[in-house]
């Protein structure tokens, strides 16, 4: 039996993690949950899974939840509450499925407590990849990726020598605007971008998918997860989302991980690793697949991918700037306050306005994150 803490249990990855646990009660037990402010959803989760502790980020919502459930479970709030969930003594695995850089500090604290990390919060490695890897090595902690692409690569690397990698090939669905003309994308609204063709994801990730920023962030994540240089990481658009990613070795043979586009697959693999257990997801039937297609990403239509590569090449604090700017701009786009192409436009401006430096601790990164968020708000408001 593995004890699971979930950071972000009411979001897309969190609820699908609970579905995996629900299907395997003999293998997994929930000991801690957290949410931003959806107390109705987390109250239902409390009644079903009986955790020891629950964190609600917004203090007022936490107080309301505590009044509702009485002394059934300890309720905490704020970043301190997320840290309590991440470092709970009884937890074996911490699923980091919160969205954005808010996941950074709890993830670091979980690593320092020796917890296995099932990483779904890609921003943690985007912002502080080098620091996270050092902490994981220092505390002998394993980071198991939950993103479908990185889970695929992780699986393709099993039993292989990482030094024999020729390149990593990340697949991208192409997002909601894959077949749109650039002039039409200019006038797109949030509801258009949220119509993802293959995956069921949260709103922020779905917008990032439409801009290809999600793939850019995944390139940065792969750089640190697998210790592979940037020039060995390629992106290819694969609309069917059946080949989840591939690894090419120095003999030019390619190993791919293939399966139905269902996030419960990589989630379950991360929880059960190194074992494989029976799954309830759809079984892939090759007789029903007419074609698997691949194409190069269009970085003219989707400049966010190039910006992500550029920020990683520059390194230092620049990835933190790119990430923080993108998070704020996606919020503005979801609120219909800016256009779709304002996202890369203002990210590029923020990168130009920033003079990157070599950071030594998390507080410096948080300072950069605060700076870029305020800078973006000043430019737009």
From Swiss-Prot:
Output the InterPro entries linked to this UniProt entry: DXP_reductoisomerase, DXP_reductoisomerase_C, DXP_reductoisomerase_N, DXPR_C, DXPR_C_sf, NAD(P)-bd_dom_sf
Q: Identify the keywords attached in UniProt to this record, alphabetized.
A: Isoprene biosynthesis, Manganese, Metal-binding, NADP, Oxidoreductase
EC class of this enzyme?
A: oxidoreductase
GO terms (molecular function) for this protein are: 1-deoxy-D-xylulose-5-phosphate reductoisomerase activity; manganese ion binding; NADPH binding
Q: What's the superkingdom here?
A: Bacteria
Residues involved in 1-deoxy-D-xylulose 5-phosphate binding: 122, 148-149, 173, 196, 209, 214-215, 218
Signal peptide (residue range): none
Q: Which reaction does it catalyse?
A: 2-C-methyl-D-erythritol 4-phosphate + NADP(+) = 1-deoxy-D-xylulose 5-phosphate + NADPH + H(+)
HAMAP family from the entry?
DXP_reductoisom
Q: Which NCBIfam families match?
A: Dxr, PRK12464.1
Write out the similarity annotation. Belongs to the DXR family.
Q: What is this protein called?
A: 1-deoxy-D-xylulose 5-phosphate reductoisomerase
Lineage here is: Bacteria, Bacillati, Bacillota, Clostridia, Peptostreptococcales
